[in-house]
Amino acid sequence: MITLRPITDDDREFLYRLYVSTRAAEKELVGWTNEQWDEFLRMQFNLQHTQYMRNYEQPSFDVIMLGDTPVGRLYVNRVPVEIRIIDISLLPEYRNRGIGAGLMRNILREGNDSNIPVTLHVEKNNPALGLYQRLGFRINGDQGVSWFMERVATPVFESGRQNIPSP
């Protein structure tokens, strides 16, 4: 069963390992030693973590759990005008298993229920771009290396069902 729990200081190494897994494809491009790569990624991880902690009004920073096993992270900022998905990441062995899509659909329902858009940024080369588009996100801005995407709230039908596409 998939659950979420707030991050703690004890999660720092897991979160770093998760972050490293999202950057694995880049390692071959730079030609650095393992020590140089690790030092660079630790610096980047710490900067990202600090920026996330400081720059959002109503954030929730959660570890995605599969039973007792941490498998990813979901960071979301909820404010009256939008729900911003700050970050959703899964360890490689848990990707493409419907975990992320299920969590995304839950957030989209929340946006529909509150009648506010769900937004996110995604790097242009991120394979998740296709999932986001299938879930109804549309590109709403070019940020250079990333897209700003938005999914507007859709009405709840009289039957009580919402129009949330399956991926």
Please describe what each predicted stretch is:
Residues 91-97, 124:
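Active-site acidic-Proline motif in GNAT/NAT acetyltransferases
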Residues 96-109, 130-134:
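Conserved acetyl-CoA-binding loop-helix of GNAT-fold acetyltransferases
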Residues 1-3:
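Extreme N-terminal starter segment of soluble prokaryotic enzymes
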Residues 52, 132, 137:
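Conserved active-site tyrosine of GNAT-family acetyltransferases
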Residues 111-123:
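Conserved GNAT acetyl-CoA-binding A-motif
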Residues 9-12, 16-86, 91-92, 104-110, ...:
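Acetyl-CoA-dependent GNAT
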Residues 5-7, 121:
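Surface-exposed loop and edge beta-strand positions of immunoglobulin-like domains
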